[in-house]
Design a protein with these regions (language model features):
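Acidic/negatively charged segments and metal-coordination signatures
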Residues: 1-157, 161-242
């Protein structure tokens, strides 16, 4: 029987398998590595295509309006190379709900995101993998995730604090920087049986900051009883403003 990630390593080191030979056995051709390489190319290409679609369909001031809503102020200049774009970009394209009246052309019949409107109008332009990726990004809202364990260079065991779900997120760069008990505001999607970050806030939160998220959770439960994916979409502004 193959060793589980949390089982003692078969090599006899006494260390958990995921901290020992698991990482060594991961090759550039394993599913996560192959998916990562494919995703990097698809993500950049789709982001450019969605941005072109948004500017054409919503007007040139779309970026300014999105930034104002995201930061709650109009005083933050947009700099695509800034760390803040790490969270703003994915939220703007995949999660920000656009009123029907804002669309100049190619708009949906009801409120929706840029990505969902693009899928309605131009899904036929996408290959199957790109379409699945875009659909996964549309389905998932941003939430707060607490790091429970880290396998550097491979991924993180994380808990969605608001929905109470645990996931192993395949993530190379963040797994080298984040520590257990830190929290991130992130956009975790499910694709090809893996969980991946499609977007993340630029600054990790420390354990002391969790109290504010617990207060948010209590407020959400008071309003909705059960915190679901649909609730997080509906309460995006409150979650983002925490």
């Amino acid at each position: 029987m193959a060793a589980g990630r949390n089982d003692p390593c078969p090599c006899g080191s006494g260390i958990k398998y995921k901290k020992c030979c698991f990482a060594k056995e991961r090759s550039p051709s394993d599913p996560a590595s192959l998916l990562w390489r494919r995703l990097n190319a698809v993500d950049e290409e789709l982001a450019r295509e969605l941005l072109r679609f948004a500017l054409k369909s919503l007007g040139k001031d779309f970026l300014d309006r999105s930034s104002d809503e995201f930061f709650g102020t109009s005083s933050v200049p947009i700099d695509v190379s800034s760390p803040e774009m790490q969270g703003l970009g994915p939220w703007m394209l995949y999660c920000r709900t656009i009123p029907v009246k804002d669309w100049l052309r190619d708009g949906p019949a009801k409120r929706g995101t840029i990505a969902s409107a693009y899928l309605q109008r131009h899904a036929s332009r996408l290959d199957a993998f790109s379409r699945r990726y875009l659909e996964a990004c549309v389905e998932e809202p941003f939430s707060f995730y607490e790091v429970e364990d880290v396998t550097p260079g491979q991924g993180l065991e994380m808990e969605d604090v608001l929905r109470g779900e645990r996931r192993y997120v395949s993530e190379r760069s963040a797994s080298g920087m984040l520590r257990p008990r830190q929290l991130v505001w992130g956009h975790v999607i499910s694709l090809e049986s893996l969980h991946l970050f499609a977007g993340m806030g630029s600054i990790p939160l420390e354990p002391i900051d969790k109290l504010e998220i617990v207060h948010l959770l209590a407020w959400l439960r008071k309003r909705h009883r059960l915190v679901t994916t649909a609730v997080l979409r509906r309460e995006d502004a409150s979650v983002r403003g925490t």
